[in-house]
């Protein structure tokens, strides 16, 4: 059963909770479990921000499909490669094979190591390079 939550007009939480774990990273107590946070962004194009741990994989995929409501998935934004964020990448690529990956320069070689494919999904990846920010000073009344 899908379990999604609207965060804002165009953003839907599609993650899932895992109550099996007693400790995060086998170190920090988590008496109420852990949530694997992932979001679908709906606009002219659609994007999925992160995936989830394989332990909640079926629920996660069901949530993403429900949030998309029949629309195709255009982008998968891979934040980083820890399994609790990246374990479902291959399943997402299988289910929505026409999507485009958005990754950083360090993530792309890791994807190729962890998810050996014919390379087509990775060859078309949009690699985000350095980002510069302008510091703004806001007036205080």
Region spans (language model):
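Conserved small/polar residues in nucleotide/adenosyl-binding loops
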Residues: 134-140
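Short, conserved active-site loop motifs that form the nucleotide-linked donor/cofactor pocket
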Residues: 11, 125-126
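A generic, well-ordered mixed alpha/beta core segment in the N-terminal half of proteins
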Residues: 86-112, 116-122, 128
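Conserved beta-strand hairpin/beta-sheet module of binuclear metal-dependent hydrolase folds
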Residues: 4-66
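Active-site metal-binding motif and surrounding structural segment of the metallo-beta-lactamase
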Residues: 44, 55-102
